[in-house]
UniProtKB/Swiss-Prot annotation:
GO terms for molecular function: mRNA cap binding; translation initiation factor activity. Residues 566-577 have a biased composition (Acidic residues). Transmembrane segments: none annotated. It comes from Aspergillus clavatus (strain ATCC 1007 / CBS 513.65 / DSM 816 / NCTC 3887 / NRRL 1 / QM 1276 / 107). This is Eukaryotic translation initiation factor 3 subunit D. The RNA gate region regulates mRNA cap recognition to prevent promiscuous mRNA-binding before assembly of eif3d into the full eukaryotic translation initiation factor 3 (eIF-3) complex. It is found in: Cytoplasm. Component of the eukaryotic translation initiation factor 3 (eIF-3) complex. Residues 301-315 are annotated as: RNA gate. Belongs to the eIF-3 subunit D family. Residues 162-174 have a biased composition (Basic and acidic residues).
Length: 586
């Protein structure tokens, strides 16, 4: 058989059919292969090996099918072929900051859910109603359902959680007085509504004056020599802080119908500066006949001088297991220390001389020379009357307040005698928790005095506002603010005086943005409410109320209490004192 060549085999194949599967004719357009498509489809790659991994952000089978399945189907590609490829990828570029940052403690600020249980108490006042408290003057006070902490935390919305928040102490404070079962809550008003009240500040008039004053020692105004500061001395002097209803002069003025409302400057200043307060406090209100007395309990928190109450990082109470060093800087310990400093600083900064003292119209009404063994402290009591009447009032509404001044000084220009209010700020430890970012007084007081004073105005807003209010009520000519620091930051036993700064009371109030009109509006509103509650009562009936600042929220609550409330406690305390005296004598 003759051999067959490959060319012959190829030539023998049928010419009408090609090798392979049959070619359909429905995808040909004028002899050119054509694939149907929609202009709305995105053009993609046949196979994209540079796309993100399927394991990233996988959230279950449904998310996987939705995000990754059939990504490379024709017309469904997510990567555009026409993206401009950047030469250098800057998505991972970051700036490295080598500066050291300070960590701010944020526990306890604005936690809206922490005190939710307390928020359920109250009625219309909490929801923004106008149940009793009204604005004095034009306009109506509108309350809201959001309570903002005056230190900056947002009390209703809370804050973002941070690292180890579970291990940080909660800023839960105890009330100044426990609410008893037989008390009835009448009103609840938040500070945002109190801040809207306003009454034109009245000009007071002097009714009478008691006591005497020593001259202020001007040497304290000079900058002390380094390492030669004056130590604060504990002086034994007879000083009195009698409440309103126990003041014999106020009782005489009430019998003469000289006014309708009676108070002392320390009680009235707390009420007028209430929107700045953070800690809990309480005021007892006694309504007898047509007279209203703003009173205080024995050993009330109003008598204590707080420290860094308005600081963002305020001092905290510690547990029983804490060390001695931590217990020195608790709010209660610092308040006792500051009260001791203020009492002794006012006594130390005067020149005690019987020949040069300035006497008032009457002697000290609380001093009994036959019973007291200690010499009398320099103190002047001025009883002043303020007119809080409005044009629509049928009868005038006057308030008598007992004010205090601490020293006297001659004006270097005119030679006139100026009455002074002497107070002291105290530093415990600028590096300890609760210091509020205060500067070191020993090194910065005289070189950066403005910064030191500004920090104190921020951290002790309520304290300085009360002092300025008391000085304005007393019509004092100037204020002396002393700066007293611990001799050893780890001990509260010894203190040194670093310097004294002078202010005019109204200038200090202006620097702190203190609105006295708002304070008078608060007082007038509470007086109106008390009178309205007892409008249908018998004239001789004695009714008693307690006004309490909530310890954890910017809210005031008014309670109706039995007439003998706190009197039993005073009698029990007197009996304990008598027993202790008898045991000591035996």
């Amino acid at each position: 058989m003759a051999p067959v060549s490959i060319a012959d085999l190829v030539a023998a194949l049928p010419s009408e059919d090609s090798w392979g599967p049959a070619t359909p004719s429905d995808n040909m357009l004028e002899g050119v292969p054509y694939a149907p498509f929609s202009k709305g489809d995105k053009l993609g790659r046949m196979a994209d090996w540079t796309s993100d991994s399927k394991d990233r952000d996988r959230a279950g089978r449904q998310a996987y099918n939705r995000n990754y399945r059939d990504q490379q189907v024709y017309g469904a590609g997510t990567s555009s072929l026409f993206n401009v490829q950047v030469a250098e990828d800057e998505s991972s570029f970051s700036v490295v900051d080598n500066t050291r940052t300070t960590t701010k403690r944020t526990f306890g600020r604005g936690g809206g859910t922490v005190f939710r249980g307390r928020a359920q108490r109250g009625g219309a006042g909490q929801r923004g109603g106008r149940a009793g408290f009204q604005r004095v003057g034009a306009g109506r006070g509108q309350g809201g359902d959001r309570y903002y902490d005056n230190r900056g935390g947002r009390g209703n919305r809370g804050r973002r959680s941070g690292w180890k928040d579970y291990d940080k102490p909660q800023r839960t404070r105890e009330p100044s007085v426990n609410v008893r079962p037989d008390w009835t809550m009448l009103e609840e008003v938040d500070f945002s509504r109190l801040s809207k009240l306003n009454l034109e500040a009245p000009e007071g008039e002097d009714l009478d004056s008691y006591g005497f004053l020593y001259y202020y020692d001007r040497s304290y105004d000079k900058a002390p020599v380094k390492n030669a500061e004056r130590r604060l001395q504990a002086l034994d002097r007879a000083a009195y802080n009698v409440t309103t209803t126990q003041d014999p002069i106020i009782q005489e003025l009430a019998e003469k119908n000289e006014a309708t409302v009676f108070a002392t400057s320390d009680i009235l200043s707390m009420l007028m500066c209430a929107p700045r307060s953070v800690y809990s406090w309480d005021i007892v209100i006694v309504h007898q006949g047509n007279k209203i007395y703003f009173d205080k309990r024995e050993g009330a928190s109003i008598d204590l001088v707080t420290v860094n109450e308005n600081a963002a990082d305020a001092p905290l109470e510690v547990t029983d297991s804490s060390g001695k060093q931590e217990s020195l800087n608790t709010p209660s310990a610092l308040a006792l220390e500051a009260t001791f400093i203020n009492h002794n600083f006012a006594l130390q900064t005067v020149v005690e001389s019987e020949d040069s003292k300035v006497g008032f119209s009457h002697p000290n009404p609380f001093y009994n020379a036959s019973e007291e063994t200690e010499p009398l402290a320099s103190k002047g009591y001025k009883y002043r009357r303020f007119d809080m009447s409005l044009q629509e009032d049928e009868e005038p509404l006057n308030l008598i307040v007992r004010t205090e001044v601490d020293a006297v000084m001659k004006n270097p220009v005119s030679g006139e005698e100026q009455q002074l209010v002497v107070k002291a700020l105290n530093e415990f430890d600028s590096k300890a928790p609760g210091s509020g970012g205060a500067l070191d007084w020993r090194s910065k007081l005289w070189s950066q005095r403005g910064a030191v004073v500004a920090t104190e105005m921020k951290n002790n807003s309520i304290k300085l506002a009360r002092w300025a209010t008391q000085a304005i009520l007393a019509k004092a000519d100037a204020m002396k603010l002393g700066f007293v620091s611990r001799a050893n930051p780890r001990s509260a036993a010894g203190h040194v005086v670093l310097g004294v700064v002078s202010y005019k009371p109204r200038d200090l109030a202006a620097q702190m943005n203190l609105n006295l009109g708002n304070g008078w509006g608060i007082v007038r509103t509470i007086v109106d409410r008390i009178q309205a509650l007892d409008a249908n009562e018998e004239e001789d009936k004695v009714t008693k109320y307690v006004l309490i600042k909530d310890p954890n929220r910017p809210v005031l609550r008014l309670y109706s209490v039995p007439a003998n409330t706190f009197e039993e406690d005073d009698e029990a305390a007197d009996e304990q004192e008598e027993k202790a005296t008898e045991e000591s004598e035996e």
